[in-house]
Amino acid sequence: MPHQQILMLFGLLPVATNISTWWNFGSMLLACLTLQLLTGFFLAVHYTANINLAFSSIIHITRDVPYGWMMQNLHAIGASMFFICIYIHIARGLYYGSYLNKETWLSGTTLLIMLMATAFFGYVLPWGQMSFWAATVITNLLTAIPYLGSTMTTWLWGGFAINDPTLTRFFALHFILPFGIISLSSLHILLLHEEGSSNPLGTNSDIDKIPFHPYQTYKDMLMLTIMTIMLLTIVSFFPDIFNDPDNFSKANPLVTPQHIKPEWYFLFAYGILRSIPNKLGGALALTMSIMMLLTLPFTHTSKLRSMMFRPFMQLTFWTFTATFLVISWTATKPVEPPFTTISQVAALMYFLFFISNPIMGWLENKIMKL
């Protein structure tokens, strides 16, 4: 029977005995992706990619389409769940040295970039006030590119300002990118199982492994159940918790919101962008805030893989986590003292983590030799 063969495949998949709950977020991300694809399809059926009708079509979905409110809220809050899971997934990779599995890490970072692009395009689609102005601010960064900037911006906008062609192509990109994410996710999983998962100790797991089914399948199901309960609780009782009040008004190019800010999951990158008082410098810092993840497999100098036995690196990691939260917080505040100073210091500390990583490894190796 085909389903028995699938179970056999999972049953024969060897997994380290000591992997913790932090290793469950990969399967949760797969569940989030499936949810986003299904709800996204049903929303696309009723959505109209036109600047005069987009906002009204969202209202139509939530009011008139049977269970449209649920689809819309599941899709919007599901995106937040997706990013919560992916940030925990990346933090796990950083802490336990999973980035030393180079191919898996590099494909995962590419997935993150694609996911962020997809989420950005999706945020523009309701054509609310904050959607419009966030799109204006972020796409305007392309003009900072020397020589090509203005041409690229005009090409992306489909004119000399954000208008109907921009919304149409953003909808097309938001629809097509998830298929790229599916393909790359498959590659990511394939590359992971070439070498196998790491473990909290950062040691070779070959000497002590158990079958994936039933042990890990039940563990995955528990975490998926918890995530589903959380998601449905927010959808049912606090559906607007992540929404911006400005986005309940239709886009008006003549009125600028008092404070333009993206969704919460982009705040760290937006905070880094704002901390540099130069357009090109800010755009480069924004790009580097993600691209720095690509350097980790090549700058690891410690003899130990995991941070479990590296107290100095643990301190650095938790400082980095706090920095991430501080940048996100300052990005929600207006551009005035003391927030500008705090965000500049936090942005500097954010990048210092990637610089201190090889130095800490070298220092620990020296201490171990004493």
Curated annotation (Swiss-Prot):
Parts of the chain that traverse the membrane: 25-45, 69-90, 105-125, 170-190, 218-238, 280-300, 312-332, 339-358
Subcellular compartments: Mitochondrion inner membrane
InterPro entries from the UniProt entry: Cyt_b/b6_C (IPR005798), Cyt_b/b6_C_sf (IPR036150), Cyt_b/b6_N (IPR005797), Cytb/b6-like_sf (IPR027387), Cytochrome_b (IPR030689), Cytochrome_b_C_euk/bac (IPR048260), Cytochrome_b_N_euk/bac (IPR048259), Di-haem_cyt_TM (IPR016174)
Keyword hit for Electron transport: yes
GO biological process: mitochondrial electron transport, ubiquinol to cytochrome c
PANTHER family in the cross-refs: CYTOCHROME B
Protein name: Cytochrome b
Organism: Chilabothrus strigilatus fosteri (Bimini Island boa constrictor)
Name of the gene: MT-CYB
